[in-house]
């Protein structure tokens, strides 16, 4: 018998969105990737780095990438840590803050991977629900768990919490509030200023969505230097390879390209939302690069299968709270036009 830890043997694990090997034969709208390529400057930086210098270890501190992030976000580099995807930061925050039997919390529905990461550490998981108006329910006036994860904008629903609400929540926690801003570049507000105002707020970002670098696995966190120092103690000492560091620095430096990609996605999101509503779909106003939409018959499974049969991938969740709808990533205008055409063919249902 292999001597696995009991909690590892019993846990279900996280299931990511379907990634077909023949990806180019699909319209892929199921994992919130960017429909546009990375900045040409990113590709140039990667090509320049992909030489004989790869025999050398990368900079363990990711200094050039952190310096570019400092310019973009307005923080000293000592407040920033680069990561192998924002998931690495989320994992290390749990490792740093929540021991076996200690509690972490998050809103359900949101990013369920928080729970998986906590299970690995043997931490207890507590979830709080949402009202029909998307107000969190049941959070105590003073919550003493070790970590509280808040996905803002929410995924998979796309709505945002106000900065006033987030500040109030930070003041009610004895532990760390992690504001997961994976999709914030498609929204209007960020919690970065709360990092300066509260010593228990951490903001995480990813390069997978707005910077078109899902394939590189890049992320970062911004927090007080003492939190960053703790995370640096437990991360892989060479957590970003040379190519990833070059890509991150170049992506952050090319803000005009980044802003134009975001503009086009937001424009397409508005158009697609209006088209869905004309078809009778209920669409939650979204601040992400996706929308959550329910068909007139509230049969998300029917629409998911119908789109799949037409080589269009979207995300359907089996959670009863979500099964009536679909999360649909915002692709190019052409991809979304083909998706609307397919939805018209599928009709409103019974």
From Swiss-Prot:
User: Which reaction equations make up its catalytic activity?
Assistant: L-histidinol phosphate + 2-oxoglutarate = 3-(imidazol-4-yl)-2-oxopropyl phosphate + L-glutamate
Q: Identify the domain of life.
A: Bacteria
Which residues, renumbered to this chain, carry the PTM N6-(pyridoxal phosphate)lysine? 209
What Pfam families does UniProt report for this protein, alphabetically? Aminotran_1_2
Q: Which GO terms describe its molecular function?
A: histidinol-phosphate transaminase activity; pyridoxal phosphate binding
Coiled coil segments of this chain = none
Subunit note: Homodimer.
Protein's name according to its UniProt entry: Histidinol-phosphate aminotransferase
Question: Organism, per UniProt?
Answer: Citrifermentans bemidjiense (strain ATCC BAA-1014 / DSM 16622 / JCM 12645 / Bem) (Geobacter bemidjiensis)
Gene designation: hisC
